[in-house]
């Protein structure tokens, strides 16, 4: 996945050194875009192995509208543990905003259901958008949304997705985000009868934490391999009916993972 390695190199070479909320320090650029043709393979890093189990379960958890880590914990996924309270709650994070955005009148808006309806009804629409950034609730979230808005686009029977990510931890977070939204695009394409198009990833503050520099340089010494393919159970036609067992990454050959500390 050369696009991702180019991002690592660009930030190392051109980024500005900055302080940050966690006190760790970062090297950062503002504004960067990558594009992945999903017909050419599933965009997952081959220069370090990713934990696909966590990515799939997290996406299913988002789509369920869940904001408590119990489901993740029950399935051995720990990526949200640092931010949960003693009851496992995270506040009104992604799942709530995607599926139950308060409408101001005592009800809620299911953005995902509305998105699917609009893709089927009016695929040329320029309003195929889901936002997780709710200013009225952002202060109550354990972690404000980093990947905060995405838009779908249909052309010639192909479904593309563009994600805007306001804050991008490019060593630990971005590979997960690429795989997660690529998978979401494949799932939405399947249930709406479309073919997968491109995944476009637009980054706002794209940063390497200072304690990830050496790990990034190590990864840049590795040679990317051919991308794997993601098999999705073709029998599933309801986005909310997918289960972990409905996905299988095939022909995934990757170098060993590279450990790096997470900034909380």
Swiss-Prot record:
Binding site for dUMP: 21, 126-127, 166-169, 177, 207-209
Record carries keyword Transferase: yes
PROSITE patterns: THYMIDYLATE_SYNTHASE (PS00091)
One Gene Ontology cellular component: cytosol
Metabolic or biological pathway: Pyrimidine metabolism; dTTP biosynthesis
Primary location class: cytoplasm
One family name in Pfam for this protein: Thymidylat_synt
Localization annotation: Cytoplasm
Catalytic activity field: dUMP + (6R)-5,10-methylene-5,6,7,8-tetrahydrofolate = 7,8-dihydrofolate + dTMP
EC numbers: 2.1.1.45
This protein's UniProt keywords: Cytoplasm, Methyltransferase, Nucleotide biosynthesis, Transferase
Domain of life, source organism: Bacteria
InterPro entries, alphabetized: Thymidate_synth/dCMP_Mease, Thymidate_synth/dCMP_Mease_dom, Thymidate_synth/dCMP_Mease_sf, Thymidylate_synthase, Thymidylate_synthase_AS
Full protein name: Thymidylate synthase
Native source species: Mesorhizobium japonicum (strain LMG 29417 / CECT 9101 / MAFF 303099) (Mesorhizobium loti (strain MAFF 303099))
Gene for this chain: thyA
